[in-house]
Design a protein with these regions (language model features):
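Glycine-rich phosphate-binding loop used to anchor ATP phosphates in small-molecule kinases
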Residues: 66-122, 129
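Hydrophobic anchor at the beta1->P-loop junction of P-loop NTPases
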Residues: 9
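Conserved substrate/cofactor phosphate-moiety recognition/catalytic segment
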Residues: 26-77
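A glycine- and Lys/Arg-enriched "phosphate-lid" helix/loop adjacent to the NTP-binding pocket
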Residues: 122-169
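ATP-binding Walker
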Residues: 12-15
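NTP-dependent small-molecule kinase module
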Residues: 170-174
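Phosphate-binding P-loop
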Residues: 1-4
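Walker A/P-loop
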Residues: 18
Length: 174
């Protein structure tokens, strides 16, 4: 069986993308790249003036960032960051499809419409999106205790972070 050289696993935060992606990549002998890591790299070579959404957490503990923003602000920052990241993600995907080693990209930055637009001219690309019920997303967020441990107000952090993920899941499926 021949597989496309570039695979994508997208979906909302905490749905299980990273776990699924690592298993698939290992089974196929592919590299595995998280869009979270791409975002960190982009942040390291940009400024708040050029990439404001990528720098939304600058100088703020991530737990305080989530607890202190509205759900709408969190979603706007996330979607804006993904837009800022997309040129770099697309360039990497095209390089791997054309001449580099097979790779699986995973992350919530893999917005369906952006990836679908590439399917028209990239025959070495295949994608899947994981979704979950609101209840499962809540269970997974609450189960990720290391993520919110140390927050000054854990329930407030979850009360903002979880609805952001649920709304992203809903928008992604629309």
């Amino acid at each position: 069986v021949t597989h496309p050289k570039v695979l994508v696993v997208g979906g909302p935060p905490m749905v299980g993308k990273s776990s699924v992606a690592r298993l698939i990549a290992a089974r196929l002998g592919y590299g595995c790249m998280s869009t979270d890591d791409i975002g960190l790299a982009i942040k390291s070579v940009t400024t708040v003036e050029t990439h404001p959404h990528s720098h939304a957490m600058d100088g703020i503990d991530y737990r305080d960032y989530y607890a202190g923003r509205s759900v709408e602000q969190l979603l706007d920052d996330g979607m804006g960051m993904h837009e800022e990241m997309w040129p770099g993600i697309e360039a990497g995907m095209r390089a791997h499809a054309d001449w580099s080693f097979p790779i699986l990209y995973e992350g919530w930055a893999m917005w369906p419409e952006r990836v679908a637009a590439l399917l028209n001219d990239m025959d070495q690309l295949s994608a899947v999106w994981l979704t979950a019920s609101d209840e499962l997303l809540e269970q997974r967020v609450r189960g990720a205790e290391r993520f919110y441990a140390g927050a000054s107000d854990q329930e407030m952090m979850i009360a903002k972070y979880l609805p952001r993920n649920i709304e992203y899941n809903r928008l992604m499926m629309d």
